[in-house]
C-alpha cells in the first residue's frame, strides 16, 4: 500500500506555486486614483466638446458666406436688369400753354416707348384698353423688393447643435458649490419657560421663610 501511494505521488503533475507580493505603493495609488482619473476624463470630455463646437461654428460661417455671395449675385443681376430697362424706356414730355384773361391752362403730353409694341420683351401686342395696365406692370417689375441678407443659417440643426454644445460646455466648466443647510434656530424648538414654574432653590427659600414665621 505504501509503495502504491509513493508511485501515485511521484506520477502526479504538481502545479507551480503562486507567489503573491503585496505592494503598498500600488495599493495606495489605486485607492487614491479614482478622483484623479475622474478629473482626467472630465478634461478629455471638455476638450472634445470644444473641438466639436469649433467645427460646427466653422461650418455655420461657411454656409452664411455662401448665402451672402448668392444674395450679392442676385442683387447685381437685378440692378443690371433695371439699368437695361431704364436705357430702353425713353419718355418725351410736351407742354403747351394757353393764356386766358382770367387763368392760364397748361396741357402736358407724355409719350413712353412701348417695349411690348417694339417686340423688345417678347410679349404680344396689347390692345389700346390694356396699355395702362401694361405700363403699371412694367413699373412694378422695375420696382422689385430687395431681399434682406440672411441673418441665420438655413439649417436649424446647426444652431441647435451649437446651442446644445455650449450648454454642455458651461455645465461641465461650472464649479459645484456646496451649500450648507442653515441650522435651525434653537429658540423656535425650545418652549419658553413658564412664568409660574419655580426652581428648587426658590421653593426651599419659601419653605424656610414660612417655618421661621411660624416659630416666631
Swiss-Prot record:
Residues 120-216 are annotated as: Disordered. GO terms for cellular component: cytoplasm; nucleolus. Its main location: nucleus. Keywords: Coiled coil, Cytoplasm, Nucleus, RNA-binding, rRNA-binding. Residues 171-183, 200-216 have a biased composition (Basic residues). GO terms for molecular function: identical protein binding; RNA binding; rRNA binding; single-stranded DNA binding. It is found in: Nucleus, Nucleolus; Nucleus; Cytoplasm. Residues 129-140 have a biased composition (Acidic residues). Belongs to the RRP17 family. PANTHER family: NUCLEOLAR PROTEIN 12. Interacts with KIAA1191. This is Nucleolar protein 12. InterPro entries: Nucleolar_protein_12. Residues 33-97 form a coiled coil. Multifunctional RNA binding protein that plays a role in RNA metabolism and DNA maintenance. Participates in the resolution of DNA stress and the maintenance of genome integrity by localizing to sites of DNA insults. Also plays a role in proper nucleolar organization by limiting nucleolar size and regulating nucleolar number. Mechanistically, regulates the nucleolar levels of fibrillarin and nucleolin, two key players in pre-rRNA processing and ribosome assembly. It comes from the Eukaryota. It comes from Rattus norvegicus (Rat).
